[in-house]
Amino acid sequence: LKMSLLYTDNMVLQRDVPLTVQGIANAGDRVTVSIADRQMKTKAGLNGKWSVTLPPLKAGGPYTLKISTDETGFQYQNVLAGEVWLCSGQSNMEFMLKQASTARADIPRAVDQQLRLYDMKARWRTNAVEWEANVLDSLNHLQYYKDTEWKNCTPATASDFSAIAYYFGKMLRDSLNVPVGLICNAVGGSPTEAWVDRASLEYQFPAILKDWTKNDFIQEWVRGRAALNIKKSANSQQRHPYEPCYLYESGIRPLEQYPIRGVIWYQGESNAHNWEAHEKLFKLLVNSWRKNWNDACLPFYYVQLSSLNRPSWPWFRESQRRMLNEISHIGMAVSSDHGDSLDVHPTCKKPVGERLARWALNKTYQKNVIPSGPLFRGANVRGGKVFLSFDYGKGMRSSDGKPLQCFEVAEYDGIYYPATAEVVGDQVKVYSKEVPNPRYVRYGWQPFTRANLI
């Protein structure tokens, strides 16, 4: 009898959905699964695989989940039913609570028996080193993540857990008052394409699979780091965590059919060189994961890249904003006001995690919470001035009490000039004496921006 590594003591099962439990036994073995007052029996198929679907559980517990055959069995203790979220992406999602600017104040208070953490950490970080033969062999067998187990939230466990995921989960706990389980499998430096399933890329983006270590669709830094890590390999098919599909195969497929409520995602730094390719990849990513969980409406809330002195980032952030209108059941947390001009890893993570939680509370849980700051809806021109309207624009103001800044306007020639911007009711009026016939407006269009509209 063999179960997914997600099945451990202290696990959280998704409430209010049919509860699929599956595993592997000897062909023909009778398998019994029971939890609370529910029990189901089935027989393992010729390939040993078996699956049962139990009626939904309400939030609560603790329960004991029992899975047995005639010869052997497992008992998982202290199991809760609640809300399960996957927290994924690259290093800013991986960034630990103990590294955050709020660590000293918040770690001692991180005590919650009903917040459970499943922390999938990499066995080998993708640092600037050449990996040895045993590492390279393990990678070829998709053995990239350390074995782990569900743990109660304590100062010790929260300290090494994702800061953004922790603050997201804490806000859900405080608002919903039900158990919350967080699964984190983020990998520093990982590009979007590593998280997409192979069939999707083969059919819809085959060019990115071709000779990936020399492929211009893939960021030069990503290719360079991978080439260094696998330098000692003589295997022309040597695998690496940054390879297209690799993290899907090693970090997402093992979670298949473990019911979750939704996903939070912070990634893009390793794709910011090519926003057009990323737009295509991001849509494939969302669809890939929705297929994996057989849920076309799986909520997917993501972080817009922060502020940093890299020229391509305004284009990338704008592309991420457009995705809000092109994919269903998603939301975007802005982070540019908490950036660091010189560090790709800003330490202020609490507001970002809580902004993701606001999207979940509003859209997934139908709570009366404003999910976002102002989001551009439309514009009209009157008398040489542009009037911008916004979703979530009630009570707009500047974040620092100073005049609005970082607005620019241009005529048809596309030459932008700094503009004056003022809140007028539920609109923002933008104008410049240098631009009598404005055609375009942009806002926060600096790699590191001090834009201040909230």
Predicted regions and their residues:
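Cell-envelope and extracellular/periplasmic
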Residues: 1-454
